[in-house]
């Protein structure tokens, strides 16, 4: 039965087509039969890092001609790939892990190939985003994927300020060397907001940490190993809060904005972000100045 389906997938591979192939995000066993069939028949395999892809191919006994297509040379390589397709070749595109063009190189190549009239076919597979969401326990069908969080604190805070009251989960990627700073910025805006940190998904040291932003900070501080490896963050939807005065998150946003903007402008922007009254926010800022 296994060979039957593999053969069927292989028979469906046709020349003059660019196959965008999803690869495992950690566990090599997560590759699909269709992905194996495409990689076996591909005349050219475009790889983000040829060394990483060579290891994947070796694990399955596949010998393919690898060419490097990275962010810095993708535009230039696109015309060469179009030439291969014009010759009737089967071309596969892979990234180091997951799906090409999603936070990885690939979009420019796919666009160019489509522009000149050749088929671009997705070969679906493992997804860190879907894996994290599937175990987060968040109800509902809506979510927002942000990709990698900005590297600079100021840019992160502006981004996080937009998520103070969102009614849907937000999924993002973060790197080990920035996770501490990112959590610190989150804690300034919503320290009690629930968060899941998924680390090393499908790998040996796969870990899922859930709790408030503050609790996740504490967990990482207690165990340095939890700050290692590839990370996916799932920020849970904001809960409706009823306070007699301004919410804590609104006050935190106003505090950040008043440090960068004139009070009136900060109050107007904070009101748009939080939905709170502009006058109440303005009066809050004045009370700080009068202390």
From Swiss-Prot:
Recorded GO MF terms: rRNA (cytosine-2'-O-)-methyltransferase activity
Keyword Ribosomal protein: no
Any GO CC annotation of this UniProt entry: cytoplasm
Entry keyword set: Cytoplasm, Methyltransferase, rRNA processing, S-adenosyl-L-methionine, Transferase
Reaction catalysis annotation: cytidine(1402) in 16S rRNA + S-adenosyl-L-methionine = 2'-O-methylcytidine(1402) in 16S rRNA + S-adenosyl-L-homocysteine + H(+)
Highest taxon, organism lineage: Bacteria
Known EC number: 2.1.1.198
Pfam families associated with the record: RsmI_C, TP_methylase
Keyword presence, Hydrolase: no
Enzyme class label: transferase
Family designation: Belongs to the methyltransferase superfamily. RsmI family.
UniProt function note: Catalyzes the 2'-O-methylation of the ribose of cytidine 1402 (C1402) in 16S rRNA.
PANTHER family with a match to the protein in the record: RIBOSOMAL RNA SMALL SUBUNIT METHYLTRANSFERASE I
Protein name per Swiss-Prot or TrEMBL: Ribosomal RNA small subunit methyltransferase I
């Amino acid at each position: 039965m296994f060979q039957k389906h593999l053969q069927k997938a292989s028979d469906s591979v046709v020349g003059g087509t660019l196959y965008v192939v999803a690869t495992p995000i950690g566990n090599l066993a997560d590759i699909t039969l269709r992905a194996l069939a495409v990689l076996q028949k591909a005349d050219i395999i475009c790889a983000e890092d040829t060394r990483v892809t060579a290891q994947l191919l070796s694990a399955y006994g596949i010998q393919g001609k690898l060419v490097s297509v990275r962010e810095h040379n993708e535009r230039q390589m696109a015309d060469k790939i179009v030439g291969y397709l014009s010759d009737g070749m089967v071309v596969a595109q892979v990234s180091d892990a997951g799906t090409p063009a999603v936070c990885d190189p690939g979009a420019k190549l796919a666009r160019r190939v489509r522009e000149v009239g050749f088929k671009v076919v997705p070969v679906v597979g493992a997804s860190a985003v879907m894996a994290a969401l599937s175990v987060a326990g968040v109800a509902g069908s809506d979510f927002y994927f942000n990709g990698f969080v900005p590297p600079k604190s100021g840019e992160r805070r502006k981004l996080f300020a937009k998520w103070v009251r969102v009614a849907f989960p937000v999924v993002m990627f973060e790197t080990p060397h920035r996770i501490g700073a990112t959590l610190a910025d989150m804690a300034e805006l919503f320290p009690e907001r629930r968060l899941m940190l998924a680390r090393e998904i499908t790998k040996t040291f796969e870990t899922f940490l859930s709790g408030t932003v503050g609790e996740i900070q504490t967990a990482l501080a207690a165990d340095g190993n939890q700050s290692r490896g590839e990370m996916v963050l799932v920020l849970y939807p904001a809960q409706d809060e009823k306070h007699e005065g301004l919410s804590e998150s609104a006050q935190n946003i106003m505090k950040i904005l008043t440090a960068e903007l004139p009070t009136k402008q900060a109050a107007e922007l904070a009101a748009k972000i939080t939905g709170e009254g502009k006058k109440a926010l303005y009066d809050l800022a004045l009370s700080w100045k009068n202390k």
